[in-house]
Amino acid sequence: MPSKPSCSRTASALVLAASLQMTTPAVADDAMPRLGVSPVRDVIQAMTLEEKVALVLGQGMAGMSGGMQGPVVGGDANSRVPGAAGTTFPIARLGIPSIVLADGPAGLRITPTRDDAPNQTFHATAFPIASLLASSWDDALVERVGEAMGAEAAAYGVDVFLTPALNLHRYPLGSRNFEYYSEDPLVSGKMAAAMIRGIQSQDVGTSAKHYAANNHEWNRNTINVKVSERALRELYLKGFEIAVKESSPWTIMTSYNRINGTYTSESPWLLQDVLRDEWGFEGVVMTDWFAGADAVKQMQAGNDLLMPGTQSQQQALLNAARKGQLDVQVLDRNIERILDLIMRTRTFRHEPVSNKPDLDAHARISRQAATEGMVLLKNEHDALPLAAGKKLALFGNSAHDIIIGGTGSGDVHEAYSVTLLQGLEHAGYATDKALSQAYAQHIKTEKARRPETNPFLAPPPLPELLPTVEQIDAAATANDVALITIGRNSGEFIDRKAEGDFYLTEAEQTLIRSVSAAFHKAGKPVVVVLNIGGVIEVASWRDQVDAILLAWQPGQEAGHAMADVLSSKVNPSGKLTDTFALDLKDYPAAENFPGVTLLGPDPAASGGIVINDRAAEVEYRDDIRVGYRHFNTRGVEVAYPFGYGLSYTRFEYGDMKLTREDAGFTASIIVTNTGRRAGREVVQLYVSAPKSNLEKPAAELRAYARTRLLQPGQSQKLVMRVEPRGLMSFDPAVHRWVANPGRYTVSIGASSRDIRHQAHFDIKDELSFMP
């Protein structure tokens, strides 16, 4: 999303903006058409060419620079909502206001202080990251989070929230995976649709992004993704299709990358043929900030709004229009969609801006959401939940310096955050004061040593404190349970690394080994809490500990939410929306991630940030074999499979009832809580297709459902519907979605590898659907 503004203001941008204004009549004429009063086409007809070009460019924050594209045209985002990403261009004489656009995926990203209000703060709620929200498998919960996010945007005068992000988790080292939902397109699309519905219920627009196949950061502005049409349609576009059809986002944001040689923002096939003609999208398409290479091609392809609008783009469009190389009707078409967007906004309706969102209420929603998406990966010897009154020894930097979310445009300026230490103490647990004081001093010292970095980048991790043998032995004697946290963070521009990120550092391995040995010698359990934004390796160390809680990056209420789950105030019910492999090399994308440079040395070898200046390419040789579609089809052993998650109680699945309807089917099943604690269960439905000329995964997720909170002994009937399209694969040879004749297997289970019931049905004649 928007790159960090340059530090210096660009005088030429202000001069150009001023000259543009001079080409516009200075005083509104009563005879002039006005937006919202006159027909939109009359308003467009009254615009000068310069105004038309200005309107399709948008505006950025003053002083922002786009590198080779030059400085932006200007804008009032900082004066309207400081820290917002940009605005559209206003034309006062025609009644056209500028509207405000702001990040981000886990909460509103704006500046918390303002020069004109020194005694007031403008914080936003930091909600859990998307990967955690998806792990709840709860569309209604995600919609409530969206409602809260939309309410904050409305309170601060933001018209379009630049979220949700729904690219697939193709590979664990993608540094923005925390912004995205899953390795599966159905989960991604359903979660994104829920988020969109929630935000837009507050009369605030959304921008589903990054369309499409934007799966890593390395060379993101130039990378060419070589991918089959089948993989595109079944995986990388499918989530967007679901979101568009189920929630009608006001805008779509194109990605930086190219697909099969064409920038996404310059692709008529992506923007017109697929998005508009096939899916029926009626909103605005905008670029990511400074994306693409040719403004004229972007306009012609149907990328309506170029953000944040640069001088070079402005000049290119003006020249092309004057020379007849850009049909003005193309501009008019794109402008009409932009004006339709503007008329939907609160700004256009002159809605008041309170600057007073209900942060307390939203913090409660954030806390609840965080608890629902945490995943219990391991729990031996009833190590969890923690009994009341237990004394706890907290090891690990992030237990005391919590990681609530990722960096870059996904960051949020929250009013506070709660550490695990604070959350457990608030929940009534005693903690080892000497140990926590040692960590506090270590963190303070290491932060003072750390050089100041670009705030848009993830800071380098602090070296992990390794307590002495004496300190660990003393803790094992004085405390009842050891809690070890493992923390990870990432964000824009730099993808994750294998060593010391996907794999534990040597210090972390030593910490787990030493603490486990001491506490187990004393007959006491060891619990690991994963405070991470993406998948890591667990197989090499999990046998040393008794329990593992995947807490993700849980937002500002992190410590309270973690304590809620560890104490059983909330029974964990989250399940994985990604596969945890045994090793990084087990992912098929490991073969050539992140890609290769086509000219010059490979900058990835030095860990450099490469944004604009190198041609690069990556071939998606894994094709449709992403995530569990690979692991389960090839029979690859994994650490934890897709859909997996434990509970403090047990659930029994009754017999499945399958009913065929209109070429699709409905499956129902009764789930009963047979344990001793109240809890929720997530049930997943997979479909296996017969062999055909196309390679097929062993099974694919086609539906899911989540029970309400079931008390011990209570049951609930869950019903899941699969439409005919859910049985089909895309056959590029005939350019159709096809369900071949033969026997189909429907599997219902607690994970992709914990199938409880199966049923079969036959299709006699081929079913097909033309895009």
Language-model features: where?
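Bacterial N-terminal signal peptides that target proteins for export
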Residues: 2-12
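Intrinsic structural disorder/low-complexity segments
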Residues: 12, 24, 212-213
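Short beta-alpha junctions and helix-cap segments that line functional grooves
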Residues: 732-734
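Short beta-strand elements
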Residues: 754-769
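Extended, solvent-exposed functional surface patches
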Residues: 7, 20-22, 26
